[in-house]
Amino acid sequence: KGIRSVQKHKKRLKQGDFFPPFLYISIINSCNLRCQGCWVDVAAKQEKIDVEKMNDIIGQAKEMGNSFFGLLGGEPFLHKEILQILEGNLDVYFQIFTNGHFITPEVAKELKRLGNATPLISVEGTEIVSNERRGKLQVLNDTMEGLHNCLDAGLLTGVCTSVCQTNYEDLVNDAWIDRLIELGVMYGWFHIYRPVGPDACPELALTPEQQYNVRKFVVETRAKKPIVMIDAYHDGDGNALCPAATGFTHHISPWGDIEPCPIIQLSKESIYDERPLKEVFNESEFLSDFRKIAAESTRGC
């Protein structure tokens, strides 16, 4: 289905129409953690997209041939209706970006019953580093408990890391990947740390050499380890890639703003505008100009 969504997207482009084949939706801004470099103002007044509006967004996207959605936060499992959103849309698939703290055995079993979501659980380093990176205590223990609940329930589960100076040595190595494989994790995703948000911490950003090494490690791991490694920053030929510049993805914030991606929090349109999403994506000069300028000036994130 995902491949068909991309094929329909490419066909639309040839006809002068635009609608991204993949939508990432931050359904709530609240979170129990306070991570360094988080692009969401999690301490702000809670904002969320309700079930009715989510069903509307997903329904409009399905009409365009979309079948895959990313759910983000804040912490998505703080949205009390997240399971209702999943159950109301069993004909599409969701990837849920989560810290895992609210995935109890019961929640994991319900996700398994629904069968249309994969949890992508974030691990940010050792116990000490996790506490520092995420602004709370016992973070790693709670995350690993959620991870084990997912695996015990038989869920297709991934682990992601925002790779930065304090976890680069601990997690970008064979030992960590081997541990994930031993646990039963099916896929990994290394994000490159971007210093943004209320607590940007630019000192945590990787050097160009370290970024290159992360890419090299991902490629080499794909060839020798029984685990899928995702890389959102390069295409199949190894060229730097910005998914928003290609138009493959765009993002909807908890406030309903339609943005290039979660990190670029600039918008002129909203899901609450009295226009169908098809019209918004086709007529947005801001998004069109962003894609054009980003593609011309740099392919990378």
Task: Report each predicted region and the residues it spans.
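Radical SAM enzyme [4Fe-4S]-AdoMet core and its adjacent flexible, acidic
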Residues: 132-245, 254-259, 263-272
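Short loop/turn microsegments at loop-to-beta-strand junctions
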Residues: 23, 246-248
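Radical SAM/AdoMet-radical enzyme domain recognition
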Residues: 54-71, 77-191
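Flexible mid-to-C-terminal extensions adjoining Fe-S/redox cofactors in radical SAM and related proteins
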Residues: 258, 263-301
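Short cysteine clusters
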Residues: 31, 35-38, 242, 256, ...
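N-terminal pre-core extensions flanking Radical SAM catalytic domains
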Residues: 1-45, 59-62, 277
